[in-house]
């Protein structure tokens, strides 16, 4: 019984910490994880179909991907 109560308390604490992060900051963290580099418009081919600026990631070759409109 103590283990269940402890698990519920820990879950509530984790949820409250997640809610404390603003949505915009969370989006910035997510974009950073995708490997988006908006300053030079390069993107990580493994990051998915979008770049930080909303452009699409186009794989030009095996080693080169760019954010294109």
From Swiss-Prot:
Give the protein's recorded name.
U2-agatoxin-Ao1c
Which GO molecular function annotations are given, in alphabetical order?
toxin activity
**What information about domains appears in the record's comments?**
The presence of a 'disulfide through disulfide knot' structurally defines this protein as a knottin.
Q: Which cysteines are joined by disulfide bonds?
A: 36-52, 43-57, 51-67
Q: Of which family is this protein a member? A: Belongs to the neurotoxin 01 (U2-agtx) family.
> One of this protein's Pfam families, by short name?
Toxin_7
Q: What is its main location?
A: secreted
Tell me the SUPFAM superfamilies matching this sequence: omega toxin-like
UniProt subcellular location:
Secreted
The entry's note on the tissues where this protein occurs is: Expressed by the venom gland.
Q: Which residues form the signal peptide?
A: 1-20
């Amino acid at each position: 019984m103590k283990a269940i109560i402890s698990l519920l308390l820990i879950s509530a604490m984790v949820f409250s910490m997640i809610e404390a992060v603003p949505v915009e900051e969370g989006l910035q963290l997510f974009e950073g994880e995708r490997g988006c580099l908006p300053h030079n418009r390069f993107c990580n081919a493994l990051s998915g179909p979008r770049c930080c600026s909303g452009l699409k990631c186009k794989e030009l070759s095996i080693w080169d991907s760019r954010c294109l409109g």
